[in-house]
């Protein structure tokens, strides 16, 4: 059985939208914010709110009704790159509806983070964003 991938790319500055994002879940101009102030992205068939604080990356997961969705059986990772160094961080379920991971050091301004996510049902996807540029 072939895996299907959803790839979204977010650029910073004036609204620049990759074709895959424009065709999937367009939210109008700018960035849609989640209930905790993080960027909302569609990935692997769920809505993900991405939060970065210090060394911690948190992904809060929501269903189509924007209700918290169980992350039981989810796996994920985050590739953090600042142009000079790269670090891969494992994202593990934390509580009922989140995944978390920590980098070795603070995430630099201008860093790009690529989130890879696999649901319990086997859906996979990835999204890239720059947390400090919003």
Please report, for each region that a protein language model flagged, where it lies by residue.
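Bacterial Sec-dependent N-terminal signal peptides
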Residues: 1-5
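Intrinsically disordered, low-complexity terminal tails/loops enriched in metal-binding residues
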Residues: 7-8, 13-134
């Amino acid at each position: 059985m072939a895996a299907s991938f959803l790839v979204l790319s977010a650029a910073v500055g004036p609204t620049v939208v990759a074709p895959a994002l424009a065709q999937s879940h367009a939210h109008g101009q700018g960035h849609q914010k989640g209930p905790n102030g993080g960027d909302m992205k569609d990935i692997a068939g769920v809505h993900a709110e991405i939060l970065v604080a210090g060394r911690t990356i948190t992904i809060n997961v929501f269903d189509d009704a924007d209700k918290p969705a169980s992350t039981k059986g989810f796996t994920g990772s985050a590739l953090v790159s600042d142009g000079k160094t790269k670090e891969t961080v494992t994202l593990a379920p934390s509580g009922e509806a989140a995944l978390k991971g920590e980098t070795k050091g603070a995430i630099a301004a201008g860093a790009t983070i690529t989130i890879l996510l696999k649901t319990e049902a086997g859906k996979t996807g990835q999204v890239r964003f720059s947390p400090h540029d919003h």
